[in-house]
Protein backbone atom coordinates (compact mmCIF):
# COMPACT_ATOMS: atom_id res chain seq x y z
CA UNK A 1 0.00 0.00 0.00
CA UNK A 2 1.37 3.53 -0.82
CA UNK A 3 0.51 7.09 0.23
CA UNK A 4 -0.51 9.78 -2.27
CA UNK A 5 0.60 13.43 -2.17
CA UNK A 6 -2.03 14.25 0.45
CA UNK A 7 -0.71 11.51 2.69
CA UNK A 8 -3.81 9.35 2.23
CA UNK A 9 -3.34 5.64 1.79
CA UNK A 10 -3.89 4.39 -1.74
CA UNK A 11 -4.40 0.90 -3.07
CA UNK A 12 -1.64 0.43 -5.63
CA UNK A 13 -2.03 -1.62 -8.80
CA UNK A 14 0.41 -4.09 -7.26
CA UNK A 15 -1.35 -4.43 -3.88
CA UNK A 16 -4.79 -4.66 -5.42
CA UNK A 17 -3.90 -6.60 -8.52
CA UNK A 18 -6.26 -9.44 -7.81
CA UNK A 19 -9.17 -7.37 -6.49
CA UNK A 20 -12.21 -6.61 -8.65
CA UNK A 21 -12.70 -2.90 -9.45
CA UNK A 22 -15.66 -2.52 -7.05
CA UNK A 23 -13.64 -4.16 -4.26
CA UNK A 24 -10.69 -1.86 -5.00
CA UNK A 25 -12.88 1.23 -4.79
CA UNK A 26 -14.47 -0.04 -1.58
CA UNK A 27 -11.07 -0.75 -0.03
CA UNK A 28 -9.66 2.62 -1.05
CA UNK A 29 -12.70 4.34 0.40
CA UNK A 30 -12.34 2.42 3.66
CA UNK A 31 -8.65 3.27 3.95
CA UNK A 32 -9.29 6.98 3.37
CA UNK A 33 -12.36 7.26 5.57
CA UNK A 34 -11.69 9.09 8.86
CA UNK A 35 -14.75 7.47 10.48
CA UNK A 36 -13.41 3.98 9.76
CA UNK A 37 -10.14 4.88 11.49
CA UNK A 38 -12.01 6.56 14.36
CA UNK A 39 -14.23 3.49 14.83
CA UNK A 40 -11.13 1.30 15.17
CA UNK A 41 -9.70 3.68 17.78
CA UNK A 42 -12.99 3.86 19.70
CA UNK A 43 -13.55 0.09 19.64
CA UNK A 44 -16.73 0.45 17.58
CA UNK A 45 -17.67 -2.24 15.10
CA UNK A 46 -18.79 0.05 12.29
CA UNK A 47 -18.44 3.61 11.04
CA UNK A 48 -22.25 3.59 11.08
CA UNK A 49 -22.06 3.96 14.86
CA UNK A 50 -21.22 7.65 14.42
CA UNK A 51 -24.49 8.26 12.59
CA UNK A 52 -26.47 7.16 15.64
CA UNK A 53 -24.09 9.04 17.97
CA UNK A 54 -24.62 12.24 15.97
CA UNK A 55 -28.39 11.87 15.78
CA UNK A 56 -28.72 11.08 19.49
CA UNK A 57 -26.27 13.80 20.55
CA UNK A 58 -28.65 16.25 18.90
CA UNK A 59 -32.05 14.75 19.80
CA UNK A 60 -31.35 12.87 23.08
CA UNK A 61 -33.69 9.88 22.86
CA UNK A 62 -31.24 7.22 24.17
CA UNK A 63 -31.55 7.64 27.94
CA UNK A 64 -30.32 5.46 30.82
CA UNK A 65 -32.79 2.72 31.75
CA UNK A 66 -34.84 2.62 28.56
CA UNK A 67 -35.58 -0.30 26.20
CA UNK A 68 -34.43 -0.24 22.57
CA UNK A 69 -34.95 -2.47 19.52
CA UNK A 70 -32.21 -2.40 16.85
CA UNK A 71 -33.35 -3.81 13.47
CA UNK A 72 -30.55 -4.67 11.03
CA UNK A 73 -27.94 -4.51 13.77
CA UNK A 74 -24.88 -6.33 12.36
CA UNK A 75 -21.99 -5.88 12.77
CA UNK A 76 -23.18 -4.06 15.88
CA UNK A 77 -22.09 -0.41 15.91
CA UNK A 78 -25.56 0.96 16.70
CA UNK A 79 -26.14 -1.75 19.30
CA UNK A 80 -22.86 -0.84 21.01
CA UNK A 81 -23.87 2.83 21.16
CA UNK A 82 -27.41 2.05 22.34
CA UNK A 83 -26.20 -0.47 24.95
CA UNK A 84 -23.77 2.06 26.39
CA UNK A 85 -26.23 4.94 26.49
CA UNK A 86 -29.12 2.99 28.05
CA UNK A 87 -26.89 1.08 30.47
CA UNK A 88 -27.71 -2.38 29.10
CA UNK A 89 -24.52 -4.00 30.41
CA UNK A 90 -25.57 -3.51 34.04
CA UNK A 91 -29.25 -4.27 33.41
CA UNK A 92 -30.55 -0.72 33.78
CA UNK A 93 -31.68 -0.57 30.17
CA UNK A 94 -32.32 -3.19 27.51
CA UNK A 95 -31.31 -3.62 23.87
CA UNK A 96 -32.86 -6.28 21.63
CA UNK A 97 -31.25 -6.63 18.20
CA UNK A 98 -31.79 -8.71 15.07
CA UNK A 99 -30.06 -9.14 11.72
CA UNK A 100 -30.04 -11.50 8.75
CA UNK A 101 -26.35 -11.99 9.53
CA UNK A 102 -24.61 -13.33 12.58
CA UNK A 103 -23.40 -10.78 15.10
CA UNK A 104 -20.71 -11.42 17.72
CA UNK A 105 -21.98 -10.93 21.27
CA UNK A 106 -22.25 -7.47 22.84
CA UNK A 107 -22.64 -7.45 26.61
CA UNK A 108 -26.21 -6.50 27.50
CA UNK A 109 -27.57 -6.92 23.96
CA UNK A 110 -30.08 -9.70 23.33
CA UNK A 111 -29.46 -10.69 19.69
CA UNK A 112 -31.21 -13.08 17.27
CA UNK A 113 -30.23 -13.90 13.70
CA UNK A 114 -33.56 -13.31 12.01
CA UNK A 115 -35.08 -11.98 8.79
CA UNK A 116 -37.29 -9.08 9.85
CA UNK A 117 -39.54 -9.82 6.84
CA UNK A 118 -40.11 -13.43 7.87
CA UNK A 119 -43.71 -14.06 8.93
CA UNK A 120 -42.60 -15.20 12.39
CA UNK A 121 -40.19 -12.31 13.02
CA UNK A 122 -42.63 -9.93 14.81
CA UNK A 123 -43.73 -12.66 17.25
CA UNK A 124 -40.13 -13.69 17.92
CA UNK A 125 -39.13 -10.08 18.48
CA UNK A 126 -42.09 -9.49 20.78
CA UNK A 127 -41.10 -12.48 22.90
CA UNK A 128 -37.53 -11.16 23.14
CA UNK A 129 -38.72 -7.66 24.04
CA UNK A 130 -41.20 -8.85 26.66
CA UNK A 131 -43.20 -5.60 26.60
CA UNK A 132 -43.24 -2.15 25.07
CA UNK A 133 -40.10 -0.22 24.24
CA UNK A 134 -38.97 3.39 24.15
CA UNK A 135 -36.99 3.42 20.91
CA UNK A 136 -37.05 1.42 17.65
CA UNK A 137 -33.98 1.81 15.44
CA UNK A 138 -33.73 0.48 11.90
CA UNK A 139 -30.52 0.74 9.91
CA UNK A 140 -31.74 -2.08 7.64
CA UNK A 141 -30.88 -1.78 3.97
CA UNK A 142 -32.67 -4.08 1.53
CA UNK A 143 -30.46 -5.93 -0.93
CA UNK A 144 -30.58 -4.23 -4.32
CA UNK A 145 -31.44 -5.92 -7.61
CA UNK A 146 -30.13 -3.20 -9.93
CA UNK A 147 -33.67 -2.48 -11.16
CA UNK A 148 -34.29 1.07 -9.88
CA UNK A 149 -38.08 0.90 -9.42
CA UNK A 150 -37.96 -2.54 -7.81
CA UNK A 151 -35.18 -1.45 -5.46
CA UNK A 152 -37.02 1.71 -4.39
CA UNK A 153 -40.18 -0.30 -3.66
CA UNK A 154 -38.22 -2.87 -1.63
CA UNK A 155 -36.38 -0.18 0.33
CA UNK A 156 -39.55 1.74 1.15
CA UNK A 157 -41.43 -1.50 1.89
CA UNK A 158 -38.81 -2.47 4.46
CA UNK A 159 -39.03 0.91 6.21
CA UNK A 160 -42.82 0.83 6.15
CA UNK A 161 -42.78 -2.59 7.81
CA UNK A 162 -40.31 -1.30 10.41
CA UNK A 163 -42.56 1.72 11.05
CA UNK A 164 -45.64 -0.49 11.45
CA UNK A 165 -43.71 -2.68 13.88
CA UNK A 166 -42.57 0.42 15.79
CA UNK A 167 -46.18 1.56 16.15
CA UNK A 168 -47.02 -1.86 17.61
CA UNK A 169 -44.27 -1.93 20.21
CA UNK A 170 -43.52 1.69 21.15
CA UNK A 171 -44.65 3.25 24.39
CA UNK A 172 -46.43 6.59 24.04
CA UNK A 173 -43.74 9.26 23.62
CA UNK A 174 -41.41 6.74 21.94
CA UNK A 175 -38.96 7.33 19.09
CA UNK A 176 -38.48 5.66 15.70
CA UNK A 177 -35.30 6.15 13.67
CA UNK A 178 -34.91 4.49 10.27
CA UNK A 179 -32.63 4.60 7.28
CA UNK A 180 -34.38 5.80 4.12
CA UNK A 181 -33.06 6.92 0.75
CA UNK A 182 -33.84 10.23 -0.89
CA UNK A 183 -36.13 9.22 -3.72
CA UNK A 184 -39.47 10.81 -3.03
CA UNK A 185 -40.83 7.28 -2.71
CA UNK A 186 -41.21 7.66 1.05
CA UNK A 187 -43.93 10.33 0.91
CA UNK A 188 -46.64 7.91 2.08
CA UNK A 189 -44.44 6.73 4.93
CA UNK A 190 -43.84 10.31 6.09
CA UNK A 191 -47.58 11.06 5.94
CA UNK A 192 -48.31 8.00 8.09
CA UNK A 193 -45.55 8.84 10.55
CA UNK A 194 -46.87 12.39 10.90
CA UNK A 195 -50.20 10.89 11.92
CA UNK A 196 -48.60 8.63 14.56
CA UNK A 197 -45.79 10.87 15.91
CA UNK A 198 -45.69 14.45 17.14
CA UNK A 199 -42.56 15.36 15.15
CA UNK A 200 -41.16 13.78 11.99
CA UNK A 201 -38.03 14.96 10.20
CA UNK A 202 -35.30 13.77 7.89
CA UNK A 203 -31.75 13.96 9.18
CA UNK A 204 -28.44 13.50 7.39
CA UNK A 205 -25.58 13.10 9.88
CA UNK A 206 -22.16 14.39 8.79
CA UNK A 207 -20.87 10.81 9.03
CA UNK A 208 -23.36 9.67 6.36
CA UNK A 209 -21.42 9.74 3.09
CA UNK A 210 -22.14 12.93 1.14
CA UNK A 211 -22.37 11.07 -2.18
CA UNK A 212 -25.00 8.69 -0.79
CA UNK A 213 -28.74 9.38 -0.97
CA UNK A 214 -28.97 7.79 2.47
CA UNK A 215 -30.67 9.79 5.18
CA UNK A 216 -32.66 8.96 8.30
CA UNK A 217 -36.25 9.57 9.20
CA UNK A 218 -36.59 10.56 12.85
CA UNK A 219 -40.06 10.32 14.34
CA UNK A 220 -40.43 11.41 17.97
CA UNK A 221 -43.31 11.56 20.41
CA UNK A 222 -45.29 8.44 19.48
CA UNK A 223 -48.94 9.23 20.01
CA UNK A 224 -49.77 5.71 21.18
CA UNK A 225 -52.25 4.47 18.59
CA UNK A 226 -53.85 1.04 19.23
CA UNK A 227 -51.56 -1.94 18.59
CA UNK A 228 -52.21 -5.05 16.51
CA UNK A 229 -50.00 -7.16 18.81
CA UNK A 230 -50.33 -7.82 22.50
CA UNK A 231 -47.28 -5.97 23.74
CA UNK A 232 -48.80 -4.35 26.78
CA UNK A 233 -46.88 -6.22 29.46
CA UNK A 234 -44.33 -4.17 31.41
CA UNK A 235 -40.80 -4.13 30.02
CA UNK A 236 -38.49 -6.76 31.47
CA UNK A 237 -35.02 -5.32 32.13
CA UNK A 238 -33.20 -8.25 33.67
C1 LIG B 1 -25.97 -0.85 7.22
S1 LIG B 1 -26.02 -2.42 7.95
C2 LIG B 1 -26.32 -2.04 9.65
C3 LIG B 1 -25.14 -1.49 10.37
C4 LIG B 1 -25.37 -1.37 11.85
N1 LIG B 1 -26.35 -0.34 12.17
C5 LIG B 1 -24.11 -1.05 12.59
O1 LIG B 1 -24.00 0.06 13.15
O2 LIG B 1 -23.22 -1.90 12.65
C6 LIG B 1 -27.60 -3.00 7.43
C7 LIG B 1 -27.94 -4.35 8.00
O3 LIG B 1 -29.31 -4.61 7.71
C8 LIG B 1 -29.45 -6.01 7.65
N2 LIG B 1 -30.74 -6.35 7.03
C9 LIG B 1 -31.17 -6.05 5.79
N3 LIG B 1 -32.38 -6.58 5.58
C10 LIG B 1 -32.73 -7.23 6.73
C11 LIG B 1 -33.85 -8.00 7.13
N4 LIG B 1 -34.88 -8.21 6.29
N5 LIG B 1 -33.88 -8.51 8.37
C12 LIG B 1 -32.84 -8.31 9.22
N6 LIG B 1 -31.74 -7.61 8.89
C13 LIG B 1 -31.67 -7.07 7.66
C14 LIG B 1 -28.23 -6.43 6.82
O4 LIG B 1 -27.95 -7.80 7.01
C15 LIG B 1 -27.15 -5.50 7.37
O5 LIG B 1 -26.37 -6.15 8.35
Curated annotation (Swiss-Prot):
An MF annotation (GO) of this entry: rRNA (uridine-2'-O-)-methyltransferase activity
InterPro entries (UniProt xref): RNA_methyltr_RlmE (IPR050082), RNA_MeTrfase_FtsJ_dom (IPR002877), rRNA-MeTfrase_E (IPR015507), SAM-dependent_MTases_sf (IPR029063)
Claim: Transferase is one of the keywords in the record: yes
Enzyme Commission number: 2.1.1.166
Residues at the catalytic site: 179
Subcellular location: Cytoplasm
Function: Specifically methylates the uridine in position 2552 of 23S rRNA at the 2'-O position of the ribose in the fully assembled 50S ribosomal subunit.
Similarity section: Belongs to the class I-like SAM-binding methyltransferase superfamily. RNA methyltransferase RlmE family.
Protein name: Ribosomal RNA large subunit methyltransferase E
Protein encoded by which gene: rlmE
Amino acid sequence: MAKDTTGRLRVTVKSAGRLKLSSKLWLERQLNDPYVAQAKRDGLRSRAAYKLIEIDDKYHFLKPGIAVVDLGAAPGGWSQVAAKRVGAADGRGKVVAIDLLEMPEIVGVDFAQLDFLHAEAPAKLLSMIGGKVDVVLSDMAANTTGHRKTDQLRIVGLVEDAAAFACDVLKPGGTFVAKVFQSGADATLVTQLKRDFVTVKHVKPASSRKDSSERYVLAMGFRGVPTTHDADAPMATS
